[in-house]
Amino acid sequence: MGFIKSTLLATVTVFVGLCGINRFFTLPKCIRYHFRYFACHTFLAISSAYGVIASVVARLCGYPVMGQYLTAKAYYGLASTILDFRFKIENEEILRKHKSAVLVVNHQSELDILAIGRTFGPNYSVIAKKSLRYVPILGWFMILSDVVFIDRSRRSDAIQLFAKAARRMRKENISIWVFAEGTRSYSLKPCLLPLKKGAFHLAVQAQVPIIPIAIQTYGHLFHPPTKVFNKGEALIKVLDPIPTEGKTAEDVNDLLHETETAMNNALVEIDDYGKVKKQ
């Protein structure tokens, strides 16, 4: 009990300290980047610990995936408020109209977890790389909340997991969030890396629509290679759904191309959001 109290006290102390420093001090660029980056991971650890508890409760109530929603919202509320880094959503109503869909999203950096927190619905689940399940606390939360894990190095296993996920989507009416590029781009330009086919096979197997989601290129706000981490707001644009009803594996390439084109166009369209143009 004494250890738990000490841990909670230390957590609260760190949290209050981070809040004060971030709000009332202007730090040099490099120090600001490392400080805010550390704060992000601190908030993630706090949210993951909360997520373990939330997921246990959600699982006992018979709806374990709700643990992901509660944890994502807690992280976004905490981190966005303290760091003053927010996302605005355009066309959010599209997400709420569909009980089940594959959400195809571009992946820029580790800060995309904030975009997840801003966008997530109560029936959403993410697909994550299998190695994350072994990360203390974070992995426990992900296991308890029924995150879909995938090992991309073993194609046969990945195919089986997608088939299982498709059955689960149809049975439970859940939507799956997929970073379809497969890796972080850290791009400063409004464009995608080539999309992987897994998300499209999943959508075809489940016979649910693909909903492309374009997260504005926010390298002017957060860009680890150049140690940039500023306050600000970025835009998330939800695009029109792409139906898969009646489609088969033979249509995957066409679906991928249609999605990729729509997302690249949207990234260019929203690139200037929140940016101060030079005169």
UniProtKB/Swiss-Prot annotation:
SUPFAM superfamilies: Glycerol-3-phosphate (1)-acyltransferase. SMART domains: PlsC. GO terms for biological process: phosphatidic acid biosynthetic process. The keyword Membrane applies. GO terms for cellular component: endoplasmic reticulum; endoplasmic reticulum membrane. InterPro entries: AGP_acyltrans (IPR004552), Plipid/glycerol_acylTrfase (IPR002123). It is an enzyme of class 2 (transferase). Its main location: endoplasmic reticulum. It is found in: Endoplasmic reticulum membrane. The keyword Ubl conjugation does not apply. Keywords: Acyltransferase, Endoplasmic reticulum, Membrane, Transferase, Transmembrane, Transmembrane helix. Its EC number is 2.3.-.-. The chain crosses the membrane at residues 1-21, 38-58, 131-151. It is a multi-pass membrane protein. One of its GO terms (molecular function) is 1-acylglycerol-3-phosphate O-acyltransferase activity. Belongs to the 1-acyl-sn-glycerol-3-phosphate acyltransferase family. PANTHER family: 1-ACYL-SN-GLYCEROL-3-PHOSPHATE ACYLTRANSFERASE (PTHR10434:SF11). This is Uncharacterized acyltransferase C1851.02. The lineage of its organism: Eukaryota, Fungi, Dikarya, Ascomycota, Taphrinomycotina.
